[in-house]
Every structure is written in C-alpha cells, then in structure tokens.
C-alpha cells in the first residue's frame, strides 16, 4: 500500500450499489480510503451538508455520477463550488458533450464514461488531487 495514499480519503457518490462498491474497491486497491454514498442528499447529510461535509470528512477527491436520484451530480458540484470543494471527478453513463462541458466549466478535474477501467479512474484521481 502506498503510505501517502493511505492518508487520502475519497468520497464516491453513485446510486448503483454495485458500481459504488466497484469504485470503492478500485481506489482502495491503490491504498486510498473510500466512503460511498447512494445520493447527493446522503453525502450532504453526512456531516452538516455543503462544504462542511467535505471538511469534516477530510475528502481529498469526490467521485460523482451525474444521474442521481433527487439532486444530480452536476447540481451537487455547483452547490459545493460556493466554498472550497475537493477536486471532482465525474464517472457517468451520461457522458454527453453538454454534461462534460458543464462539469469542466464548474471545475471538474476529470470526466470519465462508464464503464470505467480501474487504472483509468486511478489516473484521474491522482491527477485531480493536488500534490
């Protein structure tokens, strides 16, 4: 396990339990710690909501799906951008040009289409996390 990675916490928001588990397993295989959330609301409620959740959970990177029940991944990204959000990497089956443009315009550091290979995800996470 990479000692530096073991101190880095990744949050994953995806409503598909199998995908969420697979993404968690992938980042954990590289030594990161991971926590999965089934919705944006669950993530926001995890610790007072908003950027408070990011600070309290000490999140270094947020992996988001776009299509979520209730608040979408793009909307969650916008809500978090009011403060000092962690870097965001989108992993989505809805990888349209419009979604990509919107995500990147609002500061996403990565945008990957499902299905995503583990190495591709890890490359995006590593590129997103500041050194």
Residue ranges and their predicted role:
Residues 50-63, 68:
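Active-site beta3 strand of CheY-like receiver
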Residues 17-35:
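Two-component/phosphorelay signaling modules centered on CheY-like receiver
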Residues 38-39, 58-60, 72-75:
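Acidic catalytic/metal-coordinating carboxylates
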Residues 72-84:
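Short amphipathic alpha-helix used as the core "switch/output" element in two-component signaling
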Residues 20, 57, 69, 96, ...:
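The feature encodes the CheY-like receiver
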Residues 75, 95-110:
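Alpha4 helix (beta4-alpha4-beta5 surface) of REC/receiver domains from two-component response regulators
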Residues 98, 116-125:
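C-terminal output helix
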């Amino acid at each position: 396990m990479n000692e530096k990675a073991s101190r880095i916490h990744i949050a994953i928001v995806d409503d598909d339990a199998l995908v969420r588990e697979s993404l968690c397993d992938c980042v954990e295989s590289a030594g990161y710690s991971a926590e999965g959330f089934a919705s944006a609301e669950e993530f926001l409620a995890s610790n007072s909501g908003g950027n408070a959740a990011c600070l309290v959970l000490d999140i270094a990177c947020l992996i988001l799906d776009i299509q979520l029940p209730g608040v979408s991944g793009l909307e969650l990204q916008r809500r978090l951008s009011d403060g000092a959000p962690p870097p965001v990497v989108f992993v989505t089956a809805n990888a349209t040009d419009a979604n990509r443009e919107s995500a990147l315009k609002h500061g996403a550091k990565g945008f990957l289409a499902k299905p995503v290979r583990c190495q591709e995800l890890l490359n995006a996470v590593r590129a997103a996390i500041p050194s």
